[in-house]
Amino acid sequence: LGQFFGKAVAMHVVVNGQAREFKYSPDLFEMPADSPAHDLPADTGFAGFRLQEWNGADDWRTQDWVAFLGASYFRAIGASGQYGLSARGVVINAAVPGVNEEFPDFTEFYIDEAQDPAQPVVVCAFLNGPSITGAFRFYLTRGLDRRQGVEMDVEAALFLREDIQRLGLMPLTSMFWYGEYG
């Protein structure tokens, strides 16, 4: 948690079909002695998570391949090994004159590790907001050929709590890298 990710999420690990909560502890992290993270309360919580893999270097650095951090945002790397598009679970009332856009949050995650590298990692997420609630199931396949990007299949069940003027499902967003004008 911090400047950009202000809400904690509940994390669960699924093993053999059984879920157990994975509690936050500062002992899970290695931090330099002068890190401001040492000043955080012991029950701070998780802001989200990233799935990583060893990148083959001797120093055991890792390569992110999927991230779920902040509101209902998620993203995965492409064939170049870099993040490109990001997505949100839903967008509510974007660009509706006189109405504030709503940003529902993923509040809980259940991560079911793949038993075989060719099988997907399954992530379930609960979505919660003032006007909507729901559940998502993500099938995340990294692929055995690391030159490929991540394949993501998504199932969702959404339930409206009140009328919504404009609802978008998994809208994509990205940053401009370079091109004819820059």
Regions found by a protein language model. Name each.
Residues S86-D145:
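Extended, loop-rich substrate-binding clefts of extracytoplasmic carbohydrate-active enzymes
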Residues E21-K23, T133-A135, I164-R166:
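Short acidic, gly/pro-rich beta-turn/loop elements at beta-sheet edges
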Residues L1-G98:
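Solvent-exposed N-terminal domain segments of exported/luminal and surface proteins
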Residues A10-H12, V122-C124, D153-E155:
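Beta-strand secondary-structure signal
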Residues V15-G17, E53-N55, L127-S131, L140-L144, ...:
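Beta-strand elements of well-folded, non-transmembrane domains
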Residues R137-G182:
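Acidic (Asp/Glu-rich), glycine- and aromatic
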Residues S35-P36, T107-E113, D163, Y178:
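Intrinsically disordered, low-complexity boundary segments flanking structured domains
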